[in-house]
Curated annotation (Swiss-Prot):
It is an enzyme of class 2 (transferase). The lineage of its organism: Bacteria, Pseudomonadati, Pseudomonadota, Alphaproteobacteria, Rhodobacterales. Its main location: cytoplasm. Its EC number is 2.1.1.170. It comes from the Bacteria. GO terms for cellular component: cytosol. This is Ribosomal RNA small subunit methyltransferase G. It is found in: Cytoplasm.
Length: 199
């Protein structure tokens, strides 16, 4: 997914998000300084990959949203392709939550922010739970088990050590896995996980 395949309205919203991200990043650490020059590829298009992984999801929960990846990006795409989709962003840091609320307000997104630790939030029964650069897979699976509906799907964006994390997680968890190779970072993957059970 890139600018050539995205509607003008979505592209405009993504540009607004990009600009807000850089503006706020000067005050609070939303993205690393080393990735500022490559925000589109490293963060926005990378996050956009999860949009195509699930066709229908009325409730999408993004855990540890931070700077809004992938949650805000999902909400931006949903505005045009699935306006009934509600995105819930879970972020415990008050300053980052303030940024997320600003983006939601300025872009009129169907999203809300929960400012709590993930493990303290009441079960959300989501159709999709996502996370990017948040925690080890075993920890993410415990979060997903808590917040997914029975038929829900977890989408975890993982770096080059994803296969090692999967092997380690399989020692204490049972789950169905489909790995999607990342289009922005060949060694990385999006892990599509269902049927999560502790063993």
């Amino acid at each position: 997914m890139d600018a050539s395949t995205v509607s003008r309205e979505t592209m405009h919203a993504l540009q607004m998000y990009h600009d807000l991200l850089l503006k706020w990043n000067a005050r609070i650490n939303l993205i690393s300084k080393s990735s500022i020059e490559d925000v589109w590829s490293r963060h926005i298009w990378d996050s956009a990959q999860v949009v195509d992984c699930v066709a229908k999801a009325k409730t999408w929960v993004d855990l540890g949203s931070g700077g809004g990846m992938p949650g805000i990006v999902v909400a931006i795409f949903a505005k045009n392709i699935d306006p009934d989709r509600r995105v819930i962003l879970v972020e415990s840091d008050q300053r980052k939550a303030a940024f997320l609320r600003t983006v939601i307000r300025e872009l009129s997104l169907n999203a809300r922010v929960i400012v709590e630790r993930i493990e303290d939030v009441a079960p959300l029964r989501a159709d999709v739970v996502s996370a990017r650069a948040l925690a080890d897979l075993s920890v993410l699976l415990s979060f997903a088990q808590r917040h997914l509906s029975a038929q829900g799907t977890a989408l975890f964006m993982k770096g080059q050590s994803w296969e090692k994390e999967v092997s380690s997680a399989q020692e204490t968890w049972s789950f169905d896995l489909k790995a999607h190779r990342s289009k922005t970072s060949p060694a990385a993957a999006i892990l599509e996980i269902k049927e999560i059970q502790r063993v």
